[in-house]
Design a protein with these regions (language model features):
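P-loop NTPase Walker
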Residues: 1-43, 142, 161, 185-187
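Short alpha-helix boundary/capping elements
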Residues: 2, 30, 34, 85-89, ...
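ATP-hydrolysis module of ASCE/P-loop NTPase motor domains
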Residues: 18-20, 39-124, 148
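Short acidic/histidine-centered micro-motifs embedded in hydrophobic/aromatic stretches
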Residues: 26-29, 77-83, 129-130, 147, ...
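Conserved helicase NTPase motor core
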Residues: 49-53, 99-190
Length: 190
């Protein structure tokens, strides 16, 4: 996605201008925030679970329901986990979610506990932790506001609440936020 955006920009404005800019996904910015915070606090950066996250979903599903998850169960559970995290749902809101996933609140808790046991985070957690750091550490927020003064979000209709909150926070000082999207294609409803 970022390389495609860079190529499109270079085609219109030229390669020299494209080289002076950074093109990142919101997850890419989140990763930079976590790396910078780890460097500043001299802590080990978080490990992001990839295949481990899928394994944790399967194990959590089996542990909570007593059933082996089908491919559809895994897909649906992962989608619900992503939705809950990206919409910044509270535990009560998760308990009250309208979902087809049997015992989802318990699976959600078990899944997150398994990630903690492995000392890992998933890609959704990466955004959650990055936003918390930006909200709670003014020096880190100031650094990223200085580093990134202009924001263009493509496919803005697909941004989640947490992604929207992060962009709002980063661009709050400069007010240089440009979002492009098609509301008829929105996957979130806020």
């Amino acid at each position: 996605a970022t390389e495609d955006m860079r190529r499109r920009f270079a085609k219109i404005f030229g390669e020299e201008d494209a080289k002076r800019l950074e093109f990142r996904t919101i997850n890419g910015i989140s990763q930079k925030v976590l790396q910078y915070f780890a460097y500043r606090t001299q802590k080990t950066p978080f490990q992001v679970a990839d295949k481990e996250a899928s394994t944790a979903v399967k194990q959590s599903f089996l542990e909570v329901t007593g059933k082996y998850a089908t491919e559809n169960d895994i897909k649906e559970t992962q989608l619900e986990i992503t939705y809950a995290k990206n919409m910044r749902l509270t535990p009560e809101e998760i308990r009250n979610m309208d979902t087809e996933v049997e015992k989802f609140p318990e699976i959600f808790r078990t899944y997150n506990a398994k990630l903690r046991q492995m000392q890992m985070i998933d890609y959704d957690d990466q955004m959650i932790y990055a936003l918390r750091i930006l909200e709670q550490y003014p020096g880190v927020l100031a650094y990223f506001r200085e580093k990134y003064q202009y924001f263009c979000v493509d496919e803005a209709q697909d941004t989640s609440k947490i992604q929207h909150d992060m962009m709002d926070l980063l661009a709050a000082k400069s007010r240089n936020l440009f979002m492009v999207g098609d509301e008829d294609q929105s996957i979130y409803g806020f």
